[in-house]
Amino acid sequence: MKIEPLYDKTDFVIIQDYLSKCGVKDVNLWLKHKYLDDVNNYANIDEFCKKLYNAFTNKQKIYLLVDSDLDGFMSSSMFYVYCHSVYKDCCINPIFHTGKQHGLDNIVMEEIKQYKPSLLVVLDAGTNDVKQDKELKSLGWDIICADHHEREKINPYCTLVNNQISTKVKNKSLSGTGVSWKVCKAYDTKYGFNYANGLISYVAIANIGDGMSFLTPENETFRYWGTRDIHYNLKPFVCDFNGYLTDNKSFSFGMVTNINSLIRLGTQKDKEILFYALCGKIEPEEIICVCKKLHSKQSRDTKSLLEKDVDIIYNGKIILARVSKSTPLTGLVANKMMGEHNKPIILTQRDGEELKGSVRSPIDLKDILPSNLFNYNLGHQRAFGTSYQISNEKDIIDYIDSLESLPEPTQAVFMSLRTSDVPNYLFGFVDENKAYFGEGIPIPKVHFQKFGIYNKEIQLLGANQRTVKFHRDGIDFIFFNCTNKIKELLHLNDLSKKRVTLEFIGELGYNEFRGNKTKQCIIDMSTLDIHDYRIDFM
């Protein structure tokens, strides 16, 4: 395990120190929660607003492509709410993907071409859909797009608002919903409305859900104000999925993952109902239940795929793997595999002579892969969709073999400590500052140096005996979902007394139960290193 401690055990750290260490350039500005990039710094934003205004005044039907992830649903539902605020009688027709596609894929294109040409709005996608936009333009369509993905080619066929191509915009880590909000704010300014500020909850949640960096003061501004007073359309989702909690972690494991489950596994009708519930047009209780059921199904299906349907084709510096059945869960499965192997994963499924799927990596990878061997690699540097021809797979493997090395994944940790050396203040540090932790500013975790422990000191808890707990130096150490393999390594079923060596990374905090407050460490199981105990005499 290669670790990089940020601090020494003798350091006393305050949140300002930690923010600076993570990469916040101006901590005082960041903590004021008041910074926003000027909407006028966005290229083409005035033209976008004019085309939208003309569509309203001419009573055109507006077609809105709802991209197939949380950021896509947030941007589109926010835009729908905004449009109906400024022009109550506007006619907006949402278009939904059939799966986890993005932008103007072939199926969406066939649907659009059935309609009478009008205005098409594409949010959180579309930057590189040059061929599709050219075809639609020739048929009489007008296309306006607000996106945050990197531009790979010039697109003269749509009006594109994008933070990546706007040289005056500082925040390159804003979500698609954030860029869409900029358009709404610009429309407010240009035509004398004041509705955009009330919609920042959509941006805050999308920034979390799409893994946007919180090192930028603008994203912290959206988080701070967007979660202080959740928009009434979104409150039922936040209350049910998050248990009323509004820190980034609660969103990531609550509302974000549940909604993404429906987007992956739900029917077209489910997606439509979810969209209108996020818009506040229908009551959300039923679709919230559907999200929960599909999230449970997603967990079961991911586990089953990993155990039964994934074959590793090549295990080198990068793992190439194939899933034998069609599934929308390649991203989740690849993420699990990355945690297990601690190296980049390219997981695909066969579609004729093409292999399509997902890439997950602990290092920046997208730009390392040779574009001439892939049909596309679309997304972020460490998480993106991929496609290549089967005939290219050998060349891809040869290319990976030719790489001298990849950067070794490094685990950045708050401190590296012995169990006896943990400063008391660290147990309250996370709870006191949890609102600030997110992408780029991770929850502080501690690396625990190797120590020996007897199997008889370790407890198995819970009805399924899958929770592991042991007590050491005044701290309760816990991890969940213990596998049979780990039970064997820990000798938990052995009758004889055996000693093992443990090393791991964990998150510190306090556990309160019936008025008792105890120190606790939740172990990150993907970092758990177990060996039979031995003494080195030389």
Stretch-by-stretch model annotation:
Residues 124-128, 325, 329, 506:
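Short, glycine/acidic-rich beta->alpha junctions
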Residues 103-106, 153-156, 169-174, 355-357, ...:
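Short, charged, surface-exposed secondary-structure boundary motifs
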Residues 2-119, 139-140, 188-401, 412, ...:
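Hydrophobic helix-and-loop "lid/oligomerization" segment in the mid-to-C-terminal part
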Residues 117, 121-128, 443-451:
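Extended, charge-rich low-complexity interaction segments
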Residues 102, 148-149, 163, 380-382, ...:
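Histidine-centered active-site/metal-ligand motif
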Residues 3, 58-60, 217, 286-322, ...:
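Mid-to-C-terminal polyanion-binding domains and interfaces
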Residues 112, 122-135, 143-206, 212:
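Conserved phosphate-handling catalytic cores of large alpha/beta enzymes
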Residues 178, 331, 335, 504:
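Short alpha-helical basic/polar micro-motif
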